[in-house]
Amino acid sequence: MPKESGRKVVATNRKARHDYHVLDTYEAGIALMGTEVKSLREGHASMVDGFCTFYNDELWMEAIHIPEYNQGSWTNHAARRRRKLLLHREELIKISRKVQEAGYTIVPLQLYFVDGRAKVEIGVARGKREYDKRQTLREQQDNREAQREMRERNRRRG
C-alpha cells in the first residue's frame, strides 16, 4: 500500500479562531493508539472543546473527541482520553514561558495527516473579549457584502 502524500485534514477547531487571537502556531505529533489512528483515517474527530495543558514538563491535549473504532474489540480506546503531544524540548520551553504570562493559553487548531502521520496544529492564543468577537463578525459580514457587490457588478458587465 503506497504512502499518502500531502496534508489530509481530519478536523478543525473553527471555534478557536472565533474565541481567541492566535499569536503563534506549532505543528506537533500525537501519541495515539492504533484504534485512534484508524478512527481518524475514517475522518471521525471533534476538537470543539479541546485545550492543551502542561503536566511534568510535557504537553498534553485534552477534551478532543475521537470516537471508538467501529471494528475495534476490547482494544478500543476511550473517546475523550488525554493525549500526549510530541514537540522538541526548545519548543516546549518557549510555549511554557509564553503560557505562564497572564491571559495566554494553548488551543488545538487543526488535526491532520502528513505523509501518513497524525499531526495537530496548536496555537498560543489570547482570549478575545466580547466586543472583539462582535467586531470580527461585523468585518466578516462587511467583506461578504463587498464580495457579493463585486460579483454582481462583474455579472452586469459580462
From Swiss-Prot:
The UniProt entry's coiled-coil ranges are: none
Known Pfam families for this protein? SmpB
- Write the record's keywords in alphabetical order, separated by commas: Cytoplasm, RNA-binding
**Which residue windows does the record flag with biased composition (Basic and acidic residues)?**
133-152
Biological process (GO) annotations held by this record are: trans-translation
- Where do the segments described as Disordered lie? 133-158
What domain of life does the native source organism fall in? Answer: Bacteria
The protein's matches in InterPro entries, at most eight in alphabetical order, are given as: SmpB, SsrA-bd_prot, SsrA-bd_prot_CS
Keyword rRNA-binding carried by entry: no
Q: Major location, coarse class? A: cytoplasm
Cell membrane is among the record's keywords: no
State its location(s).
Cytoplasm
Q: Tell me the function of this protein.
A: Required for rescue of stalled ribosomes mediated by trans-translation. Binds to transfer-messenger RNA (tmRNA), required for stable association of tmRNA with ribosomes. tmRNA and SmpB together mimic tRNA shape, replacing the anticodon stem-loop with SmpB. tmRNA is encoded by the ssrA gene; the 2 termini fold to resemble tRNA(Ala) and it encodes a 'tag peptide', a short internal open reading frame. During trans-translation Ala-aminoacylated tmRNA acts like a tRNA, entering the A-site of stalled ribosomes, displacing the stalled mRNA.
Protein known as: SsrA-binding protein
Q: Which organism is it from?
A: Pseudarthrobacter chlorophenolicus (strain ATCC 700700 / DSM 12829 / CIP 107037 / JCM 12360 / KCTC 9906 / NCIMB 13794 / A6) (Arthrobacter chlorophenolicus)
